[in-house]
C-alpha cells in the first residue's frame, strides 16, 4: 500500500525550510536524494492506523521528508517483512525500531523516543506478578511476529516460546480478539496501545503488570546495506535536529498527555 508521500516543493525550498526551522545557516548537511528512497510503516496503535491514515510514525515520516527534501515512497507492511527487507537492503528505512545484537549487524538507528513495556493479563488467569504467568503451564502468551521488547519481556517471550506457549500474530487487533476469547491469557503492551486498553471491554477483563526494566530506546531504522555510513550520519543528524528543536515533543504531544510525552521523548 503506497501512501504517495514525497516532497512536493523543489529541493532548494526544502533545504531553506530546514535552515529556517533550525534558525541557522549552519544546519546539518542534507542527505543524498539522487535516488527515490523507501520507508515502511507498520500498523500498531498510535504509531500508525490504516483506519485513520495517521499516527506518530506517519507524522515523523512527513517531517523527515520535508526536512530532507528527498522523494521517499512510504508503504505499510507487517513488521516481520520490514525487518527482512531492511536486512536485504530492499528497504531503506522504517520507524520506531529497537536494537538488539542481531539487528545491529544489518541496521543502524537514530533514536527519538523511549518507552517501557508491560504484561497485559486476563484477570481470571490468577496472575499477580510476571513469574506467576511462567509457572502456570496452562497460560499462553500472544506476541506480534518479529517484535522484541525490553530485556525481561524478551526473556519471558523466549522462555514461553521454547515451551510452545506463544501464539504469534501479525498485529495488535488479532491479539486483542484472542485475549478476549481466552485463547491467550496475556500479551506484551506499550503506551501506543493505550487507546485500546482504555476500552471498557478490555479494561474490565484485564490487569497490567510492569516489567522491572528501564525504558527502551526506539528510533529511525536504517538499512546498512542500502545506506552508506556517511548517509546514515546525515539522517541521524536530521533526527537529532527534530529532537533539539522540539518537533519530536510536538508530535508526541498530539497523542499523549504532556507528562507521558516528555517521559518518552526526553531520555
Please state what every model-predicted region is.
Residues 62, 71-135, 146-149, 208-213:
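Acidic, polar ligand-binding/catalytic clefts
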Residues 11-22:
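Bacterial N-terminal signal peptides
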